[in-house]
Amino acid sequence: MASIEAALAEIKRGVEELIPEEELIAKLKENRPLRIKLGADPTAPDIHLGHTVILNKLRTFQDLGHDVTFLIGDFTGMVGDPTGKNTTRPPLTREDVLRNAETYKQQVFKILDPAKTKIQFNSEWLSKLGAEGMIRLASNQTVARMLERDDFKKRYNNGQPIAIHEFMYPLLQGYDSVAMETDVELGGTDQKFNLLMGRELQKANGQKPQVVLMMPLLVGLDGEKKMSKSAHNYIGVSEAPSEMFGKIMSISDDLMWSYYELLSFRPLEEVAQFKAEVANGANPRDIKILLAKEIIARFHSQADADAAEQEFINRFQKGAMPEEMPEFEFESGIAISNLLKEAGLVASTSDALRMIKQGAVKLDGEKLEDAKLIPACGTSVYQVGKRKFARVTIK
């Protein structure tokens, strides 16, 4: 294993909050492989780069010689995590959860080492609790404690319903840590309440409490909201290399440094050198190309990364249109602003109107100036800015 100081520096890279750091240092000094857990409810089949921030950190622990478990919440996925929700999340069927879980496993192994990764399902212990076990688990907390959660508090104050089973979710996630005797649990900053519940339940069960490590939420392509499919600002890990390359090149120069910190495995000293070069006049585009190629090589191959770079150069330095682009179908009567939003070319309808006004939207290579246009039936190519293309069919 690496020295404690070197290991701690690697572990803390990009971390938003570590609770508590001194306990992590004490665990590292035990000079044994720590039990590291990352849990995920397979509520959707596809993973985007925002999800990989925490997976990258799990890989760091793996590379440092620790025992890593990727826990699939097949039981909790059927309950539904209420985190950040102002309404009760619709429960998934077991068939949905298991189907999504298979896709999850295929995608996470693009980051994690399959030979060093333990996959577990929390139904292994949660389905055995039974009514008595559930009541005993619920007795560890109070309604007042649950209402300390921001999302529960807001719903309660606004008179919005909170289902009893939603109160159980943090307890079930916390019990995962008891069942696994976890040393360190990873999660996003939005999971803080649930992660700390694991510490509390471990103490109640006579275990040493886990260390909680939280990673920040990755900002999406728009530079404002967290990366998500609903915001149309994401990069899927299974997207075509050319599509990934173009999207990464579209981020702002400032956001690029955050992506380097959270998505790259390059040494921090090398990233600092890149920053110095840009400060001294180097073109940030060249540094961004290195980032794009690193990410694409990880999820596809180095050959794909090289080809995507060449296509990017051909497309934007020689004015060529990409051979591959996302394709969409819409019913006739859709407004141009809605079309651009639904095709993922802009973040919102107001953004669409602004881009049209600025002359940044093209229809089949011609500048589009009518912000009230109702596109005619047929297939056309829409372009926003230099890098975003979509082939749209109006039926």
Swiss-Prot record:
Disulfide bonds: none annotated. GO terms for cellular component: cytosol. GO terms for biological process: tRNA aminoacylation; tyrosyl-tRNA aminoacylation. Residues 334-394 form the S4 RNA-binding domain. GO terms for molecular function: ATP binding; RNA binding; tyrosine-tRNA ligase activity. ATP binds at K229. It catalyses: tRNA(Tyr) + L-tyrosine + ATP = L-tyrosyl-tRNA(Tyr) + AMP + diphosphate + H(+). Keywords: Aminoacyl-tRNA synthetase, ATP-binding, Cytoplasm, Ligase, Nucleotide-binding, Protein biosynthesis, RNA-binding. Its EC number is 6.1.1.1. It is found in: Cytoplasm. A motif ('KMSKS' region) lies at residues 226-230. A motif ('HIGH' region) lies at residues 42-51. PANTHER family: TYROSINE--TRNA LIGASE (PTHR11766:SF1), TYROSYL-TRNA SYNTHETASE (PTHR11766). Homodimer. Catalyzes the attachment of tyrosine to tRNA(Tyr) in a two-step reaction: tyrosine is first activated by ATP to form Tyr-AMP and then transferred to the acceptor end of tRNA(Tyr). Belongs to the class-I aminoacyl-tRNA synthetase family. TyrS type 2 subfamily. NCBIfam families: tyrS (TIGR00234). This is Tyrosine--tRNA ligase 2. The gene is tyrS2.
